[in-house]
Amino acid sequence: MVDYYEVLGVQKHASAEDIKKAYRKLALKWHPDKNPENKEEAEQQFKQVAEAYEVLSDAKKRDIYDRFGKEGLINGGGGGSHHDNPFEFGFTFRNPDDVFREFFGGRDPFSFDFFEDPFEDFFGGRRGPRGSRSRAGGSFLSAFGGFPAFGNAFPSFDTGFTSFGSLGHGGLTSFSSTSFGGSGMGNFKSVSTSTKIVNGRKITTKRIVENGQERVEVEEDGQLRSLTINGEANEEAFAEECRRRGQHALPFQPTNTRLLKPHKPASSPRYAYHYNSDEVEEQEKSRVASSLETPFYLSGYKEGSKRRKQKQREEQKKKKSTKGSY
């Protein structure tokens, strides 16, 4: 029979914190989306890890498991009075994906290096994934709810955080949202982030609404791919954000097709040629000279015409002289 303590790799006297750490590490290790080459085994391990955590993280379930084993949970206990067992009608294990979502419900695993240690900055002010320390620790944001534990601690600055994830066949997706607002109406800021895995690539969409302006940034594997402000592509803001991130600006492809048309000056000629003043002068001289000279073929045509007219006049004179003789 499976031993849940062995599944999580903890001692029987392990604390609740030790059990959380063990589940966090193993759930991320055996998540099926992280093991596409060995998905069948990963699904089995992922399910066992979820079962072990679901039992050992709950004091009542853990007590029954310690006394009666897994059968005590499923079949309502191995003996004794029904009053000793709150699961007298049997305990049903939840879907391992639901356990995973609940555990990471207060944080978006994609907002830092996924499959690392996403809760390290929640407990005891430990160092976070980007090297910053959280002085508030677990007292400021609860590990699962994500909302302020003490609403009156910051009366002039309210913050909210929500998050959920979806573990479907199309890949691992998640969503998180934060909002900040002071006592006045002009300081509101809302930030929402959604992330999904598409063909092995992490696509992150960040939506920022501040003082009536909406800014949407789309990243692919950490590289900014597009940026819009109020629904319009903004090349200048895109380039500025790339500089801020130290990212080489990619060729900008605006979503608005009107921006693809190049600017054409009103008085610009249809064809433009580049030449210097000497060439202009030579061309002008040549043009004037050619206009003064009679082309060869035109001169021949004129000469022939004169001869024909002269011949016609001579024939007319002969006819007149002949008539006069009669």
From Swiss-Prot:
Molecular function (Gene Ontology), one example: Hsp70 protein binding
Q: Which residues carry this modification: Phosphoserine?
A: S277
Q: What does this protein do?
A: Has a stimulatory effect on the ATPase activity of HSP70 in a dose-dependent and time-dependent manner and hence acts as a co-chaperone of HSP70. Plays an indispensable role in the organization of KRT8/KRT18 filaments. Acts as an endogenous molecular chaperone for neuronal proteins including huntingtin. Suppresses aggregation and toxicity of polyglutamine-containing, aggregation-prone proteins. Also reduces cellular toxicity and caspase-3 activity.
**Name the UniProt record assigns to this protein:** DnaJ homolog subfamily B member 6
Stretch list, region Disordered = 249-326
Which BP terms from GO are recorded?
chaperone-mediated protein folding
Gene Ontology CC terms, in alphabetical order = cytoplasm; nucleus; perinuclear region of cytoplasm
J domain residues are 3-69
Record's InterPro entries? DnaJ_domain, DnaJ_domain_CS, DNJB2/6-like, J_dom_sf
The record's subcellular location field reads:
Cytoplasm, Perinuclear region; Nucleus
Q: Which gene encodes it?
A: DNAJB6
Keyword set for this entry?
Answer: Chaperone, Cytoplasm, Nucleus, Phosphoprotein
> Mind telling me which Gene3D superfamilies this protein's record contains?
DnaJ domain
PANTHER family, per this entry?
Answer: DNAJ HOMOLOG SUBFAMILY B MEMBER 2 (PTHR45168), SIMILAR TO DNAJ HOMOLOG SUBFAMILY B MEMBER 6 (HEAT SHOCK PROTEIN J2) (HSJ-2) (MRJ) (MDJ4) (PTHR45168:SF4)
Subunit structure as annotated in this protein's UniProt entry: Homooligomer.
